[in-house]
From Swiss-Prot:
Pathway: Lipid metabolism; glycerolipid metabolism. Belongs to the AB hydrolase superfamily. Lipase family. Glycans are attached at residues 41, 261. Triacylglycerol (TAG) lipase active on triolein, trioctanoin, tributyrin and 1,3-Diolein, but not on phospho- and galactolipids. Involved but dispensable for TAG storage breakdown during seed germination. GO terms for cellular component: extracellular space. This is Triacylglycerol lipase 1. The keyword Signal applies.
Amino acid sequence: MKWLLVAVLTSLTIFSALTQSHLLHGSPVNSLCADLIHPANYSCTEHSIQTKDGYILALQRVASLGPRLQSGPPVLLQHGLFMAGDVWFLNSPKESLGFILADHGFDVWVGNVRGTRYSYGHVTLSDTDKEFWDWSWQDLAMYDLAEMIQYLYSISNSKIFLVGHSQGTIMSFAALTQPHVAEMVEAAALLCPISYLDHVTAPLVERMVFMHLDQMVVALGLHQINFRSDMLVKLVDSLCEGHMDCTDFLTSITGTNCCFNASKIEYYLDYEPHPSSVKNIRHLFQMIRKGTFAQYDYGYFKNLRTYGLSKPPEFILSHIPASLPMWMGYGGTDGLADVTDVEHTLAELPSSPELLYLEDYGHIDFVLGSSAKEDVYKHMIQFFRAKVKSSSW
């Protein structure tokens, strides 16, 4: 059983096997503004909202101190799995999307979902409670993202631009099928878009799914995946010392990345990875096994109690308004947002998004790639500018 526990916990992380001692001694980051934004000489204010199910979420509002101070429309950045809003600012200001958008005059807002170190609160629950971790990406979409969009909409009194990466695109697709959410969004730009996962090619992910490691984790009584816990770091240390090659762990989880600067791994590990829930991982694995874009599958009887149906309801991509402009960037070496699955998504949408396909780009390149500004972000910004209706910006 001990070897199984080691394998389960180790397999579910993107970064933990790369510099385990760094994770063990790194301290949690509590203020994105103080740690990354202010030192780069950008304006940043902290905001918080409470979701309908009681979670306290942190948002940051970022602006350039230059002449284009927040003259543009609001844009919400939604991170992916095991990440938080810091991922948009980890490279230099000339390379990081959050800073680049601010420099172009956008009113930049940074989302952080429940369970991350920035959004670790709840009105009644502690993070040590099992119930605190009883959520998956459908809750992140229907509660966290939907209510962040509502908050920005109420403050700016205008529709927002939405940017998502990886799990952030899963959340976006699900939320945008809801008319009351879609009507608050001006346009969406999705990096590594995912609604279907049945053609995942990342070798370690395929192995985990085949072995049903998500179900084994539940059997072991775990509810959160936190790669900064002493126990997990020590277990990963043990596994990587003579038992497996951990130097290429990122590729085995995400696919090959062309433009990710591996020399900055230790710096990135000051911030990533962030915690997530075991239930969330199980939901993602269900997507891989079943080939569906559906709500969480509790099994026949609990599905009946929860949904009134024997199978969980699917999110219908054709319910996203055809009038909502969309832009998507995806890569040929992405082991998670596989090209076949992206094409499946495109076939289900009622509109034809603008597309950027980069043959050599992988999953991490779109957020941390050193050449993403020229390869990706300038095209996204051109898309947004074409959708801005105000002539004053």
